[in-house]
Design a protein with these regions (language model features):
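Extended amphipathic alpha-helical scaffold segments
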Residues: 152-159, 210-214
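A conserved hydrophobic secondary-structure block that centers on an alpha-helix together
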Residues: 162-165
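Conserved catalytic cores of very large enzyme subunits
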Residues: 1-141, 169-177, 181-668
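Low-complexity, highly charged intrinsically disordered N-terminal segments
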Residues: 141-144, 148, 152
Length: 668
């Protein structure tokens, strides 16, 4: 669908930051007010939501149909540094930063409306009147609900003053009550999600948008209140609106603010759930061509070819999405880990790729990363120096290193205390019924660990296996000296390690065996940790986040080990592959071989997520036949049994020009 003239102008205005003149640095002094009133931690969190909502004036620009423009640049702290230090000393544990990277039950909140959830909170308060903690939480939750309702009411009043009765009607209706139109549902979702950011949280995803919004759109279409062009116009404006404030959201510097959407898949009963809004969301995301929302698509080997073609059109734009998740691997894997079937079928992703359950998970999916290259390197250096007689001894050392890394990352997290989140709790399943803030836990409370640098770690092990122990053509002392020298003076050895040893990514069973072994040992190490201190377990995954850089070059405060030169021929400081990808610079036969390699990972044990990452030149996408080929590649991804995949479109000239003229490439 082409964007209308109205929306094209709106998009360009957002890209240019035309609305930034509304912004200011005057934020409420929550710490001072809370101290003067003697408020608790939970009460302070509620006060922040209340004051931040009150500090947002209604801004309605001409022709806007989806409104909310954030004016306050900063979210204020709840304590002064001195007061926080004193309060922290009273806690029996280690407090974390604000809760983030989870997904609200947006469908339930829209379906019920905030007034119904407010009534539930008050009923629970009456039932638990003798429980001071429950009373405090529920009163805090009600205060946040009231602040959102007031914000919506002020926007409605301004819309009415401007003669925008259509917009006023939508705001009068929702989020207070269940929307009766697609427009009202989108507007309510915009406000509800924006206030999560205002409350100090980040990486606020939108979950299975095509599932929970479809009933509203279907009703409008059936009643003749809306046609498809009008529906796509509204959805496009909603997508554009998500980019108005995204530069204020933490994480945008590395291209990730967590506004992810999951499309397609099955419903909680296992029935096919692709609907007309699934298709429309793909079309609209392509027309809008902005970084938010980040589109994910659930697929199987049987997904409709035309749907995959539509997704491939979106990939062609070079935005890095859609990201694909294979239901045939993800759902059974989650069930094997302990999730109920109904919840597993309802999965979405957190900010990046970690699989979570909307409304039911208080999972911390990114507590750190195991460095496979560091584990392999430590084992190789120690084993060769000690004169280990066989390769199995190297593997035994590597397994011990992996276990040590996992334990070192998880043990401190057992004392973790999550800060109260009264408004976010309103949007989840359970807190208003139990009288307990979501920080106390929900149905699922697992931790997630990334398994980073898997190809480099496996390639290093394979080099030792082939050259030192199998062929016996490389003296251990020579390799150790070369590693210590970062291969300076050992260039021929480095070339041999890089070019003659079999590598991960070519569907070579010998090299891939090291990859599978690493993930099996990683899963075993996570399982051995048992309970995480919050009633959950440790989920191993295949993602890297930014660890593909940090584990190679370090960063301030990094807990994970940084490794130097490695036995796969990698120089000190060279980056690792991102997520599941061959080591940079390795020659691979093609994308299918890469998919076949990573399909060997035991995804029934590795459930935290992390995509196979493929980089395709943009000329691959020229012509409609090319879209068919990319669609077939996505189908092959599902057929061979991979779990998750991201395809990036690369044009070197465009990227170089974007470095020189970023203002001309704001869509990247």
């Amino acid at each position: 669908m082409p964007l209308s003239e109205r929306l094209s102008a709106m998009r360009e205005a957002v890209r240019a930051g035309a609305h930034h003149h509304y912004r200011h640095d005057d934020t409420p002094d929550i710490a001072a007010e809370a101290a003067a009133r003697g408020l608790t931690w939970a009460q302070r969190a509620a006060l922040r939501t209340v004051r931040m909502c009150a500090g947002e004036p209604p801004i309605i620009e001409p022709d806007q149909r989806i409104v909310f423009t954030r004016t306050q640049r900063r979210v204020p702290p709840l304590y002064t540094p001195d007061d926080w230090a004193a309060f922290r000393a009273t806690l029996d544990g280690d407090p974390s930063g604000e809760i983030n990277n989870i997904c609200a039950d947006w469908g339930a909140v829209l379906d019920q409306g905030l007034l119904a959830r407010r009534a539930q909170a008050l009923a629970t308060r009456a039932r638990l009147a003798a429980d001071p903690a429950a009373v405090e939480f529920l009163e805090a939750a009600v205060a946040t609900i009231d602040s959102v309702l007031d914000l919506a009411a002020r926007y409605a009043a301004e819309a009415r003053r401007l003669g925008r009765n259509d917009l006023a009607a939508a705001l009068d209706e929702a989020p207070a009550n269940r929307p009766t139109s697609f427009h009202a549902a989108l507007q309510a979702l915009r406000l509800l999600q924006a206030v999560v950011w205002l409350s100090g949280h980040m990486h606020v995803g939108l979950g299975r948008l095509d599932q929970y919004l479809w009933p509203y759109l279907a009703a409008d279409l059936a009643a003749g209140r809306l046609d498809w062009p009008g529906a796509e116009e509204l959805l496009a404006e909603f997508f554009i609106s998500l980019n108005r404030d995204s530069d204020l959201y933490p994480g945008v510097q590395v291209g990730d603010n967590g506004q992810s959407v999951m499309l397609g898949g099955v419903d909680r009963a296992g029935r096919e759930a692709v609907n007309p809004l699934t298709w429309a969301a793909l079309r609209v995301a392509g027309a809008v061509a902005m970084i938010d929302p980040k589109i994910n698509l659930r697929v199987t080997p049987d997904t409709d070819h035309e749907l995959l073609r539509e997704a491939s059109r979106l990939t062609r734009l070079g935005l890095g999405f859609p990201q694909y998740a294979n239901d045939d691997q993800v759902i059974p894997g989650l069930v094997a880990f302990g999730y109920d079937w109904e919840d597993a079928r309802d999965y979405t992703v957190a900010a990046c790729w970690e699989f979570i359950i909307p409304g039911r998970g208080m999972e911390i999916v990114n507590v750190g990363a195991v460095s496979f290259p560091a584990a392999a390197d430590a084992a190789i250096r120690a084993g060769l120096a000690a004169g280990d007689a066989g390769f199995q001894s190297i593997l035994d050392r590597c397994e011990a290193e992996i276990r040590a890394q996992v334990h070192a990352l998880i043990e401190p997290e057992r004392r973790l205390i999550l800060p109260p989140a009264p408004y976010f709790s309103v949007l989840m399943d359970g807190p208003l019924a139990t009288g307990r803030d979501l920080s106390a836990g929900l149905k699922y409370n697992n931790f997630g660990l990334h398994g980073a640098g898997c190809a480099a770690g496996a390639d290093a092990l394979q080099a030792i296996h082939e050259l030192v122990y199998d062929q016996r053509t490389l003296a251990p002392g020579d390799l150790l000296a070369a590693l210590d020298a970062d291969f300076e003076g050992y260039e021929s050895l480095r070339t041999r390690l890089r070019e003659t040893v079999t590598k991960v990514g070519n569907n070579d069973d010998d090299a891939d065996a090291q990859l599978v072994w690493l993930f099996e040992r990683f899963a075993a190490a996570c399982a051995a940790e048992g309970d995480n201190g919050r009633g959950g377990r440790i989920r191993p995954g295949t993602g890297t986040a930014m660890f593909y850089v940090w584990l190679a070059r370090g960063r301030a405060g990094l807990r994970e080990p940084v490794v130097g030169a490695t036995a796969d021929g990698r120089h000190v400081g060279d980056l690792f592959g991102a997520n599941l990808a061959p080591t940079p610079g390795v020659t691979v036969r093609g994308p299918l071989s890469t998919l076949q390699t990573f399909a060997k990972i035991p995804y029934d044990q590795i459930v935290n997520g992390g995509p196979v990452t493929l980089e395709l030149a943009d000329n691959v996408f020229r012509g409609d036949e090319a879209l068919d080929k990319v669609a077939l590649l996505v189908r092959a991804f599902a057929q061979v049994g991979c779990q998750q995949m991201q395809i990036n479109t690369v044009n070197l000239a465009t990227l170089e020009d974007a470095q020189r003229h970023p203002e001309q490439h704001r869509h990247l």
